[in-house]
Amino acid sequence: EEGNPLGVQGTQFRFAAAPPTGEDDVKKTEWQTQQVYMAHSAVTTTDNHYADEKWSRAQASLAGVDRSPFRVYLDDWQWTSSTNDLFPATLNANSEQFGYSLKLTSSAPYQKQGEQGYSTKSADGQVASYYYSQPFIDVSGEVTIDGETHQVSGEGWIDREWSSQFLL
């Protein structure tokens, strides 16, 4: 609202603790899962950097991904769309020193990384991922730092990358 530069970051990762090896790995309850979620959230001003992270196993009330409507969440840190698509969406995170509630819109085409979205990570081609970006997101909403709320607007982007193996 005042023209001061501000950076906001929300990142979520999903890891498989171990690949399924057979019938013994079949979930018997929703607490038995190989999926672990980690999220980073940050706000940066010209003078300060605020950051936090959360971890959780995949469980319906703790962390996960919903397809319809689309939602990625870890506790109250959430990317939520009203449709099956990424946009329009809201991005929310709250921490002890900072928080944000942002509206995200985009109608631009996604940008595929690598060769048509297939991104080779090693010289021998054995390590690769699928990867796309959306670098043209309109952002507006509120950012709260140390109890003071600011109206914000600007531009953002998202990267989405997935692989069948751990990427270093």
Mark where each language-model region is.
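Targeting-peptide/extracellular-domain and disordered-appendage signature
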Residues: 1-168
